[in-house]
Amino acid sequence: MTLGNSYDAFNHDPWMDVVGFEDPNQVTNRDISRIVLYSYMFLNTAKGCLVEYATFRQYMRELPKNAPQKLNFREMRQGLIALGRHCVGSRFETDLYESATSELMANHSVQTGRNIYGVDSFSLTSVSGTTATLLQERASERWIQWLGLESDYHCSFSSTRNAEDVVAGEAASSDHHQKISRVTRKRPREPKSTNDILVAGQKLFGSSFEFRDLHQLRLCYEIYMADTPSVAVQAPPGYGKTELFHLPLIALASKGDVKYVSFLFVPYTVLLANCMIRLGRCGCLNVAPVRNFIEEGYDGVTDLYVGIYDDLASTNFTDRIAAWENIVECTFRTNNVKLGYLIVDEFHNFETEVYRQSQFGGITNLDFDAFEKAIFLSGTAPEAVADAALQRIGLTGLAKKSMDINELKRSEDLSRGLSSYPTRMFNLIKEKSEVPLGHVHKIRKKVESQPEEALKLLLALFESEPESKAIVVASTTNEVEELACSWRKYFRVVWIHGKLDAAEKVSRTKEFVTDGNMRVLIGTKLVTEGIDIKQLMMVIMLDNRLNIIELIQGVGRLRDGGLCYLLSRKNSWAARNRKGELPPIKEGCITEQVREFYGLESKKGKKGQHVGCCGSRTDLSADTVELIERMDRLAEKQATASMSIVALPSNFQESNSSDRYRKYCSSDEDSNTCIHGSANASTNASTNAITTASTNVRTNATTNASTNATTNASTNATTNSSTNATTTASTNVRTSATTTASINVRTSATTTESTNSSTNATTTASINVRTSATTTKSINSSTNATITESTNSNTNATTTESTNSKTSATTTASTNSNTSATTTESTNSKTSATTTASTNSNTSATTTESTNSNTSATTTASTNSSTNATTTESTNASAKEDANKDGNAEDNRFHPVTDINKESYKRKGSQMVLLERKKLKAQFPNTSENMNVLQFLGFRSDEIKHLFLYGIDIYFCPEGVFTQYGLCKGCQKMFELCVCWAGQKVSYRRMAWEALAVERMLRNDEEYKEYLEDIEPYHGDPVGYLKYFSVKRREIYSQIQRNYAWYLAITRRRETISVLDSTRGKQGSQVFRMSGRQIKELYYKVWSNLRESKTEVLQYFLNWDEKKCQEEWEAKDDTVFVEALEKVGVFQRLRSMTSAGLQGPQYVKLQFSRHHRQLRSRYELSLGMHLRDQIALGVTPSKVPHWTAFLSMLIGLFYNKTFRQKLEYLLEQISEVWLLPHWLDLANVEVLAADNTKVPLYMLMVAVHKELDSDDVPDGRFDIILLCRDSSREVGE
């Protein structure tokens, strides 16, 4: 806004809409000035935009939140004038006109200036327009200089002053102000060169690096060299889109004068691990998760942060970017740390992911203009999708005309900023005019059972290519878990879906990508985007709702060719898509649908119509064609051998399936338990009724009568009582003819042949008839004796003859010889000869031996007596996991899986279990991943923040406490008694070990050791322990409040600790009379001595033992450091000598991993301040210990009982803490030394520790009980 008499002389256009006036021509200059002031003169610094005065007043009423009384606008103007006057008085000669100018620019009247600020009557109306402008510009220049921004700005003056406008009386005083300033931004930048990209490529790929094609080269140069602020790229999956920004990022990182910090965002958590591995290889870039940036700020090292869309949309990230320059300037004292690229991968999801669009709303608040360039990448974003996706996040959208890759031009006008400038689209798919994914063989099949067909394909693939990998895309989370548990017996499986927490998704994805032994990744469609897996040769999709984008993304995982199968059930209808979603793919040619999606020219009737689909193999690689041929030959061989693989039933949508399977299929230790009760039950249930019927029919009437008579109440009671954990025993006791038959199903082919050979003709026929699925159905339908006979008679002569011909005396004899004499006699006495023969023949030598050895004569009698149909049925239902375990593992691997009988009590639990589950859910509700036991006790969030329990995991628990294997990981119960509930974020076991940590907070070493003995009945029952813990809930809360009031005062309210307030400290320690400088000098000297002597740090601070460990000082990362400590036995000595033995054996070792991430970040940022302090002290700067050595020091001090007792005696403001996280936080608070200078408490700790080690104890000796150490300097319990 321009003031002065000559305002009318300025050529001002009516560039604004004038509202509130009937005739705009009657609007005066004063009215226009008022409109400008109230509409365009208030700045929102968070967003970097202008706001109206009404909006600004609303902010004034609400902000700042912590101010008890808000300032009004007049008071804010007065504060502005005070700053202006201070600026003029501190840097320039006081000038009446110039002082008044600052006040007038703040909209103060002349009366206000004279009465309040003591200035004579003056207004800018008394001077000419040019002079008024000059005065205002000079005031603005002083303001910029006073704010310290003159290093970022320089003023270039151009002579614009008209002599006629200058009054004579002002000429002498204004000669040196005849130039008007124009403020321009200085951006330090090292010149870029095309050679930078080539050097980056050689760093990443070696000296033989070359671009894929000319399109990739030119586009890479466009991103790095051109000033285009926003670029969108569509390239086919597998093209190398990552290198388009990876190489420019490496080139930016090589610049010495500017540090560029860039951000990459991907749609799903599963892509994080893969992206960080790819982008961090060769050490060319420092890569970190964006969560570190959001929680802790910029660390000064990272080149690229990687996150997901939810991070991009978060308010915390938006605020960090808005305050970037201020934070960097204050933290690093430089303006040479800049925001580089904002990269968004698979950005089409902003438009196509309808169900997530509400989560993307926060992205519109992001200051895109703060970044040097925005890059949007996708393999499935045609112009219409790309334009809508960009507009959805607040950008202008695509430029009207799509740019040709061969017509790259620099933009003429970029002054509007990134957010208002249209995005240039580079469509490499249209440029190349080729249908993507032609290198993949795509097959669409309708099948009876999708899982069955998928399993056949996978087994055939791994037989052809044993080192290959595959991805299976399921439609629901329940289906994912069902398939994982069913297929685990065939190959190693990793499964992922959206209900897993973020850390678990990242961990499992990383495991599949890096572990060469993992074969199959099963998941929902989130596993199909962006992930790059070596050795991937097959993708199978079982989703009927698959749209064209999901299809292209899924097939695109096959980088170097392979097979993609789209399996759908016969007579099934594709589900209706939601509003706004793309429709499912149609029947017919896949290539034609891909062409239509990308807008490519149709080639109907021409050569090349089918590309990798509809049986065409023209565009496939030789390796892919060879794989197809091998798969075809295996399929023919399987068909000839009639090997039917019966997989899971198609009903995967059972509501409670996740209760049983969730999180128990991911680790090797639980692989056996995945072959769970229901699978075994179904195996036994598949022994159809005809076998039992034929067995009973072969028992003569007299035997049946005696059998029924021997089944009494005592036998039933004994059977029921045996249903305990010893499943194997109960299974053996109830072995019947039916069970024997089911055992034979799991026997190798050789054993089956010998079994058949030892059976009479009638029985052999019956068994052979049941070898195929169709025959089994006919047998099940023929349950009476008459039809059984007809079934047997339908067996062709060839089979019977070949079976009989395989009968040898030796096999029969060996089978009978393996049956103990007692058992055989009791069996024969209760059963006819025919039954005995069939029993012996249906049992292989090994199985008969193990069964008989586990059954006494009495048990055998009761077993034989239970041969009626009812008892046989109960035997089948009670078959447990151990029945399968008795068989050969290799035999299990190759034999067919039978249908699962989903018995309600095994899948959903009994009514008592359901009731218990509901009670626990009500008592311990948790829906947040951050839920912890402190919240359950009733602590507020600000208290929980400082009474944190980070670093408390399963390794905190001693061995044997909540660490049983083979049980539910969430509640440590048997699977059929599991009380975990679907959607539970925090397991009962985790809450139990946190409750144990809370109890540790309140007990010293001896008391805690006794407590562990008292709760011994709960060592295997975390749920029972939680109930026991909850009874004392109020008492524990009150006790923590009392015992840790001092701790919360120091850490939460930051109350200052002064050594002069400690009477015992001043009287008994020289350290408490030292200045802050002396304490720091002593601290640096101790570390200098340790470094020179290569002393092992943890052992030294634990008991002053100066053992050498050179490997520790030479270690470059945390892993090598821990290995060095373990090699010299530090952790073992720590557990044997201190209270560390009350935790798990890995607890201390794991403290060096990621447990103390936030504390580590704070410490590493403080290293620069320590260096400045040393220089200020006038001493030669010494190396400050790196993080691992610093943490070793604090851990050693924590477990040094003698030192702890002395420190607590001397420093009266602190008391005992018994958890390592609390000790670490306490050690970083600041204390006032004797001269009132601040030093970190850990420096004071080292000084006290050094004083204890000194032979010359300073005046004022301590209590002998606290200070004496034995001659060996070992720390006792």
From Swiss-Prot:
Gene Ontology CC: cytoplasm
Region (Disordered): 696-763, 775-895
Keyword field: ATP-binding, Helicase, Hydrolase, Isomerase, Nucleotide-binding
Domain Helicase C-terminal per the UniProt entry, residue ranges: 454-605
EC number, as in UniProt: 5.6.2.-
SMART domains assigned to the protein according to its UniProt record, in alphabetical order: DEXDc, HELICc
Disulfide bond annotation, renumbered to this chain: none
Motif segment (DEAH box): 345-348
Alphabetical list of SUPFAM superfamilies matching this protein: P-loop containing nucleoside triphosphate hydrolases
InterPro entries found in the cross-reference section: DEAD/DEAH_box_helicase_dom, Helicase_ATP-bd, Helicase_C-like, P-loop_NTPase, RLR_Helicase
Annotated Basic and acidic residues bias: 879-895
Composition-biased stretches (Low complexity): 775-878
Factors inducing expression: Induced in absence of telomerase TLC1.
Binding site for ATP: 235-242
Keyword Glycosyltransferase: no
GO molecular function: ATP binding; ATP hydrolysis activity; helicase activity; nucleic acid binding
Function: Catalyzes DNA unwinding and is involved in telomerase-independent telomere maintenance.
Protein name: Y' element ATP-dependent helicase YEL077C
